[in-house]
Amino acid sequence: MNVSKKTHALEVWGDLACFTRPEMKVERFSYPVITPSAARGIFDAIYWEGIRDPHGMKPYFHWQVERIELLEMPRYIALRRNEVKGIVPGTAKLNRWMNGAEIPEPLWADSDDATTGRTQRQTMALKNVRYRLTARIIPKPGFSAPEQINKFDSMFERRAKQGKCFQQPFFGCSEFPAFFEYLQPGEHQKQPVAFDQHIGWMLYDVFDLRRDVVRDDKPFISLFDATVVGGVLEIPPFSDEKVRKPERGQV
């Protein structure tokens, strides 16, 4: 199967970010650097497309993040945020509500039930973040002809240069917007900061990027052993053995 020979680089920045470590999800505590999943989400927000059908979404491709470069040192800030204890319904449930198959159930900010309603939680977030992200397009079967790949690359480049996005990119939480600029190959770029850290097991993604159809499915958690050297975090391909994944059907 052909893959895109072209890589795309974005410089992204924002005031706040929180890439929550899964072992600390009640009181949020951020990784010191953006996760591959969050980086992929920024590329997706600019351009990601596929064929929609009743069974889900058949994407033309997925983004493979290859490198994350820190352009500012990680700095933490303690925040207290109002959150709700309930879980936002998935697409399948929303469709049942819209079709009248189920009665809509709102998320109440205040409730007599101790398991629902609002709560204040501590968040250890990052402030004044700036990264350079490098990724390439990995086409799905049936969409890997060279002319198709060139079309996807051109559409992303055009949209990114014009600052267009389907939804506002964000850094881990939707309250923390991310701003972006497309970087031309070879242009003068800021050097990564002098930061070295063995992060350990880091969240790679919450979806199975190998799947040809995206559904409102259970999370598919993958991890990798992350080490930042000289302000650079190299990301292995999703198919690499370095990325620890559950067996299909065991999520």
Language model segments and positions:
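Solvent-exposed loop and beta-edge segments used for protein-protein assembly and interaction
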Residues: N2-S4, H62, T123-V129
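Intrinsically disordered, low-complexity acidic/polar segments
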Residues: F19, I77, K140-S144
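Short, charge-patterned binding micro-sites
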Residues: H62-R80
